[in-house]
Each structure stands twice: as structure tokens, then as C-alpha cells.
């Protein structure tokens, strides 16, 4: 009986030892998997693209770099770009992620992008914007609001890029716009896709396109509209309804 009791006591202590050992091992594994960051105060970057006159500048209040990676987490970033000394933009937000390896910047939370080309200035607001510096492409799939001296525009996202002719195009998805002036003769328009070539005074509306001017509603497959002169330049398969 004493022999059996002794064996049981040994087994109990052995079980406790193994349980304690495994617990500590798991804890050590979790500890080793923790991500390490290096923090920097008020960092700055200047990125110049090879064989072009394009340049980008980035400043932030703080930056945290994940160990052994070229990825930075930024607080209160300010981003500026110059495309061949013609197109300029600046952007600010609450947070951002900079990937130097991919040459990409993701800005989030209260993003304000200002685009300037010649005498045209556009203010764009969203909660998230992706900046692809290598391909000179800015885009967002979030709700976007645009404000200019002439109009306001809301859309379900945008895409800014430079086409083969070197012209900057802003493309808006499921967009609607209206004139800033609250007058009887103000205009309103909407379409599945709205294209704005910067700098210009025209919109190209594609897919379920509608323009309302004064007492007339024009619906068409495609409409080219000058928002400065309030004139329709051209349209495809259109019909006019007067109220």
C-alpha cells in the first residue's frame, strides 16, 4: 500500500513539473514573436524619381519603424509632390503608413489633399487615400468630397493618374456635383463615372449621365459639360425634359 502511495505521489509531482515546463515554453514563444519598433521624432524624407523631374517630400510628428523592415507608421504626416514642375499636391492626415520598398504611402483619418496645376486648385477630402509614388497614381475607394471655387462634388472613390499624353485625369465613381452659388440658375449633374482632365473647365459624364440646368433636365449615355460657361459641349443618345 505504501509503495502504491509513493508511486502516485511521484506521478502527481511529475505531472505538475511537465505542466509548468510547457506553460513557460509557450510563454517564451509568444514573447519571442512580439514585434519590435524603433521610434523617431520629426523625421523627414525626400524621394526623387530616377530619369524624371518628379519629387516627393514627407514629414511627420513621429515615426515608428518595424525592425528589419522599410515600413514606417507615421503620426500627423504632411506629404508634398511635384510632377515635372507642373503639377503640385500636398496632403495631410492623422495617420499614415509609408512603405519605402514599394514607394507607397497610405494616409488615413481626415485626409485633406490639395491639388494645384496652373491657376486651378482642388481640395479633396476622404478618410483614406493611397499614394503610389512610383506610378504617379493617387486613389481611394472611400467616400470623397471635392471643393473648388466653382463646384462641389461627392463620389464613392477617385483615381488620379497621368495619361499617355501627359495630362492628369481625375476619375470619380458614382459621382454627383453642383454649383457653389445658391442661385436659381445653378447646375447639378451626376453619372456612374465623371472624368475631369486637369487643368480644364469640363467634365465628361459617362453612364446614366444627367445634367440639370435652370428648368431643363438632360439625360444621356455620355455628356461633356463646361461648368464655367454652364454649357453642354456634346452628348450621346440624349433626351431633354423641360419642367
What spans do the regions from the language model cover?
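Mature-chain termini and adjacent capping regions
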Residues: 1-243
Amino acid at each position: 500500500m505504501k509503495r502504491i502511495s509513493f508511486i502516485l505521489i511521484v506521478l502527481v509531482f511529475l505531472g505538475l513539473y511537465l505542466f509548468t515546463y510547457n506553460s513557460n515554453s509557450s510563454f517564451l514563444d509568444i514573447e519571442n514573436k512580439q514585434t519590435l519598433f524603433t521610434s523617431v521624432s520629426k523625421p523627414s524624407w525626400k524621394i526623387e524619381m530616377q530619369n524624371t523631374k518628379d519629387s516627393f517630400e514627407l514629414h511627420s510628428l513621429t515615426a515608428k519603424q518595424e525592425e528589419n523592415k522599410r515600413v514606417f507608421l507615421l503620426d500627423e504626416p504632411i506629404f508634398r509632390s511635384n510632377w515635372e514642375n507642373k503639377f503640385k499636391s500636398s496632403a495631410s492626415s492623422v495617420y499614415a503608413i509609408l512603405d519605402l520598398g514599394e514607394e507607397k504611402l497610405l494616409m488615413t483619418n481626415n485626409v485633406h489633399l490639395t491639388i494645384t496645376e496652373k491657376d486651378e486648385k482642388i481640395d479633396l477630402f476622404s478618410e483614406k487615400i493611397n499614394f503610389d509614388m512610383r506610378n504617379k497614381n493617387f486613389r481611394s475607394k472611400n467616400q470623397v468630397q471635392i471643393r473648388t471655387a466653382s463646384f462641389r462634388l461627392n463620389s464613392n472613390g477617385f483615381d488620379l493618374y497621368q495619361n499617355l499624353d501627359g495630362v492628369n485625369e481625375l476619375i470619380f465613381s458614382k459621382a454627383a456635383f453642383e454649383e457653389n452659388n445658391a442661385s436659381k440658375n445653378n447646375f447639378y449633374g451626376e453619372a456612374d463615372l465623371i472624368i475631369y482632365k486637369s487643368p480644364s473647365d469640363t467634365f465628361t459624364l459617362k453612364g446614366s449621365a444627367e445634367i440639370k440646368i435652370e428648368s431643363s433636365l438632360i439625360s444621356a449615355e455620355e455628356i461633356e459639360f463646361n461648368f464655367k460657361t454652364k454649357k453642354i459641349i456634346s452628348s450621346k443618345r440624349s433626351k431633354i425634359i423641360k419642367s
